[in-house]
Amino acid sequence: MPSVDLNSDLAEGFGIWHLTEDEALMDIVSSANIACGLHAGDPEIMAKAFAYAKSRGVAVGAHPGFPDLWGFGRRRMPFTPGEIERLVAYQVGAAQALATYSGHRITYVKVHGALGNIAEQEPEVAVAVANAVKAVDPSLVVLAGPLGAQAPATRDAGLRLAAEIFADRGYTEQGHLIPRSQPGAMIHDPVAAADRIIAMVQSGAVITAQGTHLPTSIDSICVHGDGPKAVETARYVRERLEAAGIAIAPFAP
């Protein structure tokens, strides 16, 4: 039976404030991207998320972003490529430490928000991310879009790439995510999200907002944990995939 991973961005909160429904989503997904403390997350939330993921057999990865609490890591910040390398390395190290503390281990890295968008479009930033991952632990997989700058940068660094598509985001004709400020960027309807995912997985392509098919491998599907219907969407996407004969399994167990 063919399989694909289902992931979500989790541990996104601070103190008593929690944005994501971590436990509900980890009962559905096969991989959890854990915020590393700069755009969201703190030691307590991270440790709890790692421990629960371990108990559910969910793979975990580091989800580093810009240090922008106010903007949730979704605004560009003026860091140089060298500074981005160290920023990513710092957060991956924090995730490794707290995963180990919790009896789990991270197996991959996926950059968050604005940093992820920039890394997909600017080769020097993609190289910085790859360099950081390789320096910290070259066994870690990089989870990223298959049609942007991260794919070649990851491979050139000798790292393994896992190709990710999004259930709840629209795509441009270039295979990038439509900016959140533009129409068609977000897909909130669980049925529409699942319909798109089934079509993309079965056709082996990213399908743009205009209907263009951009052929690619697909290793993982992301449902954003902060969406208003995140749990409902993740559950429905999983049910539809399994009904289509596609198993859900982590790409980096």
UniProtKB/Swiss-Prot annotation:
Q: Give the EC number.
A: 3.5.2.9
Q: Which Pfam families match?
A: LamB_YcsF
Nucleus as a keyword of this entry, yes or no, is: no
Q: Where is the signal peptide?
A: none
Example GO molecular function: ATP binding
Enumerate the InterPro entries for this protein. Answer: Glyco_hydro/deAcase_b/a-brl, LamB/YcsF/PxpA-like
The protein's annotated catalytic reaction(s) are:
5-oxo-L-proline + ATP + 2 H2O = L-glutamate + ADP + phosphate + H(+)
Broad class of enzyme this protein falls into:
hydrolase
Q: Which UniProt keywords apply?
A: ATP-binding, Hydrolase, Nucleotide-binding
Which processes are annotated in GO (biological process)?
Answer: carbohydrate metabolic process
Annotated family: Belongs to the LamB/PxpA family.
UniProt function note:
Catalyzes the cleavage of 5-oxoproline to form L-glutamate coupled to the hydrolysis of ATP to ADP and inorganic phosphate.
Designated name of the protein: 5-oxoprolinase subunit A
Which lineage?
Bacteria, Pseudomonadati, Pseudomonadota, Alphaproteobacteria, Hyphomicrobiales
